């Protein structure tokens, strides 16, 4: 008897008509009456389940066994596939035999009722069994695969940057310090906040590289946009400028969304029904946007100030003097209202707002930096041209009181053929949250790490 998956059965139902099959999986749902029992069986191959049925008069032994089976139990089932063209599913399994592989206890937390998001977060080890989070994590996998597909297709080299580092790449001081690193490594060691520095080094040999891995920030933030451990996509290209960077960002975002829509359409439809029917139309809007709009930081301030002054919008923060850091409310207004739900590039930020390694523009006030803003989420991606002049970089570090002892290797690269380099960091979990229509980034990662708690 052939072992098959739910995915195979649903993709080609006619192929299995009247065939005997066996399948292993978990009981997602059970409906029972006096003389008939229906099981919904999931095997992980599809977001959809296989309906299995047995009548007491046809198979009293199997009927009796299934009366005792609890939700989440693991089973092996055998039977005959019957086509059901008038039902919701194209087929069902007429049970002949059932083996109860692991009986779940009756207090299984994910019973057939509504649960809050906080309930699911407190049961992160189980929530992937719920249809919503099954969909999110399947899309996470599809999105991860698409990242590698895009970069390899475009001749980028993968750099596996270290998790342990002696550098604070962003210079913000929000790092996790490794205990006993002074005695083990003979210097203070951190969990990485970015793979950028390593990527820059490799870009000077391969020209086009990327990293994709976990990063860590010791920010005590309790917003729906922040995690202490999250994943970053960080390409770096030698001889590139801001224009090249924005084209790469736009191409990458469109490619990733297309791949999700092609390879996880069932999962997107589930999330659209669960959260918002706008999810899919929003994704289509991004794909169809020929060129993402671009505005200067100073222009963004002028737009925000005009809207605030004319009372078109009531911002919580109304100070729009040069040098203010744009808040999420400002970013969302620009994307959603002024640019009518389009992605938006904002470029040339004040150098005081950005990291020390960004190239200073000729006005000596701004840096060649870019952020990509998306509707409903705000900033999702940030990048820049890198400062290639060694003396300029040293002066910048000095003005910010950055100790360069652990950065000597990074500075030294400028001595030996470092003409130009540009790169960006794209928040993988934020992008996933946007694609899935999630309001909280904690629901986009398997086991969220946030300030104040770590339970798994």
From Swiss-Prot:
It is found in: Cytoplasm. It catalyses: tRNA(Asn) + L-asparagine + ATP = L-asparaginyl-tRNA(Asn) + AMP + diphosphate + H(+). GO terms for cellular component: cytoplasm. InterPro entries: Aa-tRNA-synt_II (IPR004364), aa-tRNA-synth_II (IPR006195), aa-tRNA-synth_II/BPL/LPL (IPR045864), Asn-tRNA-ligase (IPR004522), Asp/Asn-tRNA-synth_IIb (IPR002312), NA-bd_OB-fold (IPR012340), NA-bd_OB_tRNA (IPR004365). Its EC number is 6.1.1.22. Keywords: Aminoacyl-tRNA synthetase, ATP-binding, Cytoplasm, Ligase, Nucleotide-binding, Protein biosynthesis. It is an enzyme of class 6 (ligase). GO terms for molecular function: asparagine-tRNA ligase activity; ATP binding; nucleic acid binding. One of its GO terms (biological process) is asparaginyl-tRNA aminoacylation. Belongs to the class-II aminoacyl-tRNA synthetase family. Homodimer. This is Asparagine--tRNA ligase. The lineage of its organism: Bacteria, Bacillati, Mycoplasmatota, Mycoplasmoidales, Mycoplasmoidaceae.
